[in-house]
């Protein structure tokens, strides 16, 4: 079952990719994406001169829009170009170029008269990939996950308002977090656009209530690194990072094209109708980037297939590799990885499935290694907000009931209105 989807693929000597984007049950598509295999290619006489493969940089990005699609579309068309124009990029400092490029994208939108009254915004999860290194920049709650012999290694972390570090910046800038949202409105704390939260002239762009300033992760590629997945929260709200990696790995073992694996994952996540209340109804965009590491496409597929056949790393069950099979759906997540996993070996690589604390995300679980889960996904403040609202409403209702009991005639006259007010409060809570 597909709802207004589009897919594409490509490859060069360094990597191959497949992507798919689906509108889902939303009335409009607000996601955008970018896939550029040669970021430094020079245009001469109407044709492009390719960069030497040993020096080539590829760029991939997912931009999940909210409040409209204009900022997301601008980001999809321009972020990679803006990053490539940064002074740091020319000097080979890709990490700084990504940070500067995100902020420069905000400035470019502000300076464009077409966007003078624009209120929309978007997340940005992007990756620059060389022959032996990956840079991941993230602002918002789209996510980048590396598949390492079937194990999910997060290369980005969601920016949520209830995270202690994010909440501290929001408060210092004059904002607040209510029900897990910035000023009771925005469900993420970093984004491109959203200029209504960036109006403090005395503060730097990094200090605003909402900032486009990204976190950047740098990863040295090893032979165990098989692929990178970049996707918006339409995927991650339905599946854990580990389940996505296992699903992708099974599709590769079954020799499916990468864009087809993306399509199957989206069909798997898509709710059967629009009545589920959000999960499985969102726009979805997903990119899988295969890390060739000196291999041909065929050799890369064969290597992963052999690893799966030999039980080298976790993988989804064989039936998940069948083209007609759509996987577990949003109500049935994959189980944890096998108990014979070599924990010490994984620690030596800088991540660990077992050592991470289990964070509940939607209907699945997410393992966030080497991070403080209270800082990243602390729901306690949000829960306190909800509790305080409920206690306040209950106190009001108790006071109203006491007053009405003193005046029976008044109680009879106002009983209908009190019921309506209570219903509205319950709905809003």
Swiss-Prot record:
It holds the Pfam family PP2C. SMART domains: PP2C_SIG, PP2Cc. It is found in: Cytoplasm; Nucleus. Binds 2 magnesium or manganese ions per subunit. Residues 405-419 have a biased composition (Low complexity). It catalyses: O-phospho-L-seryl-[protein] + H2O = L-seryl-[protein] + phosphate; O-phospho-L-threonyl-[protein] + H2O = L-threonyl-[protein] + phosphate. Residues 320-348, 384-429 are annotated as: Disordered. Residues 384-397 have a biased composition (Basic and acidic residues). This is Protein phosphatase 2C homolog 2. It comes from Aspergillus fumigatus (strain ATCC MYA-4609 / CBS 101355 / FGSC A1100 / Af293).
């Amino acid at each position: 079952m597909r709802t207004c989807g589009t897919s594409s693929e490509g490859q060069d000597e360094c990597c191959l990719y497949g992507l798919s984007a689906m509108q889902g049950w939303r009335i409009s598509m607000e996601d955008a994406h970018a896939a550029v295999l040669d970021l430094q290619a020079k245009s001469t006489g109407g044709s492009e001169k390719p960069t030497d493969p040993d020096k080539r940089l590829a760029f991939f990005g997912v931009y999940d829009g909210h409040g409209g699609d204009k900022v997301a579309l601008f980001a999809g068309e321009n972020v990679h170009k803006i990053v490539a124009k940064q002074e740091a990029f020319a000097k080979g400092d890709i990490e700084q170029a990504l940070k500067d490029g995100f902020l420069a994208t905000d400035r470019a939108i502000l300076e464009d008269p077409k966007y003078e009254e624009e209120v929309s915004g978007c997340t940005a999860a992007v990756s620059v990939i060389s022959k032996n290194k990956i840079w991941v920049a993230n602002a918002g709650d789209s996510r980048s996950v590396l598949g390492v012999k079937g194990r999910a290694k997060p290369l980005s972390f969601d920016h949520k308002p209830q995270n202690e570090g994010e909440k501290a910046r929001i408060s210092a800038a004059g904002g607040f977090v209510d029900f897990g949202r910035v000023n009771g409105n925005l469900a993420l704390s970093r984004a491109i656009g959203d200029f209504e939260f960036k109006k403090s002239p005395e503060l730097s762009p990094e200090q605003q209530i909402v900032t486009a300033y990204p976190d950047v992760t740098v990863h040295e590629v090893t032979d165990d690194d098989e692929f990178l997945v970049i996707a918006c929260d339409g995927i991650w709200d339905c599946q854990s990072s580990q389940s996505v990696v296992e699903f992708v790995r099974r599709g590769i073992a079954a020799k499916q094209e990468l864009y087809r694996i993306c399509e199957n994952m989206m069909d798997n996540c898509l709710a059967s109708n629009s009545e589920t209340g959000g999960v499985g109804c969102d726009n979805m965009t997903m990119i899988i980037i295969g890390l060739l590491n000196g291999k041909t496409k065929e050799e890369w597929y064969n290597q992963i297939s052999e690893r799966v056949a030999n039980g080298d790393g976790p993988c989804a069950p064989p039936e998940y590799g069948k083209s007609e099979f759509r996987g577990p759906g949003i109500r049935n997540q994959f189980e944890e990885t096998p108990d014979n996993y070599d924990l010490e070996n994984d620690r030596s690589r800088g991540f660990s499935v077992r050592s991470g604390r289990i964070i509940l995300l939607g209907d699945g679980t997410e393992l966030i290694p080497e991070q403080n889960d209270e800082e990243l996904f602390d729901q306690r403040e949000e829960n306190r907000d909800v509790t305080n609202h409920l206690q306040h409403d209950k106190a009001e209702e108790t006071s109203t009931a006491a007053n009405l009991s003193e005046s029976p005639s008044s109680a009879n006259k106002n009983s209908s209105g009190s019921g309506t007010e209570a219903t509205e409060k319950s709905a809003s809570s």
